[in-house]
């Protein structure tokens, strides 16, 4: 059993039945806590202590706006089998997808997965679908931490005018039975930064204009809706 906290400002300590499970610093990144061994049959007490005290070890250390405290993106309980995509891997979903455009107009997707308590009977199936839901690439490999590369012909690039996305699904399987599944979306693009042309997106100069916009709302703080 995992507890997912998408964001807690600015420092959070998770306790289950009075026992500390994890302490996380930083109010803008998600984190997971494995609370399996701290739970028992019947009722359990879950406490998340959150504080927004200004300390030099957490960003931002000082600014001209208020550092609100609290849970502003909700909290989720996630139940997974004993063998699952690793939720303890740097706060991610257990998979990493890196798309790269190819010279022939296609794209390669470098896929990596991280599985907990795996053995030789487990495999990971990768499936890539375009914006219309059509499967454009698929591959199966053993459930270890080696990467697998999938090729998508005539890939549509992501840009600000045409934000094309691909959906990558990883299924953890054992003898054709799915044990765990995660899905992520990604776009194919290339970018460089040069002194003369500044930011280059997909080979085209692209002006970057920053906007000073805070997510805070009157009487609501960082949370736009009731939590």
Residue ranges and their predicted role:
Residues 27, 102-107, 142-146:
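Ser/Thr- and Asn-enriched, surface-exposed coil loops between beta-strands
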Residues 29, 109, 122:
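Exposed loop/turn and edge beta-strand positions of beta-sandwich/beta-sheet ligand-binding modules
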Residues 39-43, 112-195:
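Extended acidic/polar, glycine-enriched regions
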Residues 82-118:
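Surface beta-strand/loop "capping" patches
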Residues 108, 163, 222-223:
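Flexible, substrate/cofactor-facing loop regions flanked by secondary structure
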């Amino acid at each position: 059993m995992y507890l997912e906290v998408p964001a807690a400002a600015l420092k959070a300590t998770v306790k289950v039945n009075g026992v500390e499970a994890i302490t996380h610093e930083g109010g803008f990144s998600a984190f997971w806590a494995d609370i399996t061994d701290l739970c028992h049959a019947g009722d359990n007490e879950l406490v998340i202590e959150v504080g927004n005290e200004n300390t030099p070890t957490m960003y931002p250390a000082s600014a001209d706006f208020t550092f609100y405290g609290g849970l502003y993106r909700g909290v989720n309980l996630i139940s997974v089998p004993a063998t699952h995509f690793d939720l303890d891997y740097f706060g991610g979903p257990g998979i990493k997808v890196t798309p790269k455009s190819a010279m022939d107009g296609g794209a390669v997707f470098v896929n990596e997965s991280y599985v907990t308590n795996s053995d030789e009977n487990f495999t990971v199936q990768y499936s890539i679908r375009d914006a219309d839901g059509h499967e454009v690439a698929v591959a199966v490999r053993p459930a270890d931490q080696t990467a697998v590369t999938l090729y998508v012909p005539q890939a549509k690039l992501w840009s600000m005018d045409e934000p094309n996305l691909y959906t990558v699904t990883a299924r953890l399987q054992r003898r054709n039975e799915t044990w765990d599944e995660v899905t992520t979306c990604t776009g194919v693009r290339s970018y460089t930064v040069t002194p003369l042309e500044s930011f280059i997106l997909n080979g085209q100069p692209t002006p970057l204009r920053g906007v000073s916009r805070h997510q805070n709302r009157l009487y609501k703080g960082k949370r736009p809706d009731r939590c």
